């Protein structure tokens, strides 16, 4: 998936989002995506080639690397960015469907950008819930796969075909840890922003429903 396509996709969704949604978009692209691109190019460029073990046994280095890195950390972050962005397709598809119907019936879809009613409200709400679920799920997955969010400089490996317990060294552990912590913090920030936007939308809908019921309620005239 092209990052430019991803940007255009989310920009189209945010036409109907709240101010919190615009902040979320800025965090994703200014902090997470740009930092990811820098980290992928410079920090995780040749991670397997720079992984060293104090054993020359054929296959030992590859087995130890695969054990500690079952999936590349940088690829996992890329997958997370894609997965937290794709739920916005729900909103895009909903708007595209109604815009097509609007052209056929020559009827205005929404009063103005930022106004969400009916199906659009539900589609946007579901996309927020799914995005939040993916964010939390990937953080838990990352923590479980790598036993935390820090990269050790030394790992012990006793897997076959290693002749005994060998020491393996990871390149740039401090720099990788800093980048990972930054991405974790921005991911947590996105979760908080999603919860704020969810609360705002639900509260706004609740107040709107209460006002509508109050206005429809027949008024008793005093004599």
UniProtKB/Swiss-Prot annotation:
Which residues are connected by disulfide bridges in this protein? none
This protein's membrane topology, according to the annotation, is: Multi-pass membrane protein
What GO molecular function annotation could you give as one example from this UniProt entry? gap junction channel activity
Expressed in which tissues = Weakly expressed in placenta.
Task: Spell out where the chain crosses the membrane.
Answer: 20-40, 76-96, 122-142, 178-198
Q: Which domain of life is it from?
A: Eukaryota
Q: Which residues form a coiled coil?
A: none
Question: One GO biological process from the UniProt record?
Answer: cell-cell signaling
Q: Name one GO cellular component term.
A: connexin complex
Q: Which UniProt keywords apply?
A: Cell junction, Cell membrane, Gap junction, Membrane, Transmembrane, Transmembrane helix
Residue ranges in the Cytoplasmic topological domain are: 1-19, 97-121, 199-223
> Which residues are exposed on the Extracellular face of the membrane?
41-75, 143-177
Major subcellular site: membrane
One Pfam family, short name: Connexin
Described purpose of this protein according to its UniProt entry: One gap junction consists of a cluster of closely packed pairs of transmembrane channels, the connexons, through which materials of low MW diffuse from one cell to a neighboring cell.
Give the family, as the similarity comment puts it: Belongs to the connexin family. Beta-type (group I) subfamily.
The record's section on PANTHER family has: CONNEXIN, GAP JUNCTION BETA-7 PROTEIN
Q: How does it assemble?
A: A connexon is composed of a hexamer of connexins.
Q: What is this protein called?
A: Gap junction beta-7 protein
Organism of provenance: Homo sapiens
Give me the gene this protein comes from: GJB7
């Amino acid at each position: 998936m092209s990052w430019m396509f991803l940007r255009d996709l989310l920009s189209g969704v945010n036409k109907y989002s709240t101010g919190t949604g615009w902040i979320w978009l800025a965090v994703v692209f200014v902090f997470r995506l740009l930092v990811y691109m820098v980290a992928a190019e410079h920090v995780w460029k040749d991670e397997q080639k720079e992984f060293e073990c104090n054993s020359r046994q054929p296959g030992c280095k590859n087995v130890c690397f695969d054990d500690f890195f079952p999936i590349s950390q940088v690829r996992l972050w890329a997958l997370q960015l894609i997965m937290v962005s794709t739920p916005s397709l729900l909103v895009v598809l909903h708007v595209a469907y109604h815009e097509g119907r609007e052209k056929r019936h020559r009827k205005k879809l929404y009063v103005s950008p930022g106004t969400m009613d009916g199906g659009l409200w539900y589609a946007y709400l579901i996309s927020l819930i799914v995005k939040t679920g993916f964010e939390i799920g990937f953080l838990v997955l990352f923590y479980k796969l790598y036993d935390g969010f820090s990269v050790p400089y030394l790992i012990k490996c006793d897997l076959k075909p290693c002749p005994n317990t060998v020491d393996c060294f990871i390149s740039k552990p401090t720099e990788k840890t800093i980048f990972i912590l930054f991405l974790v913090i921005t991911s947590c920030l996105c979760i908080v922003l999603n919860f704020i936007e969810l609360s705002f939308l639900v509260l706004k809908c609740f107040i709107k429903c209460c006002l509508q019921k109050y206005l429809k309620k027949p008024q008793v005239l005093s004599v």
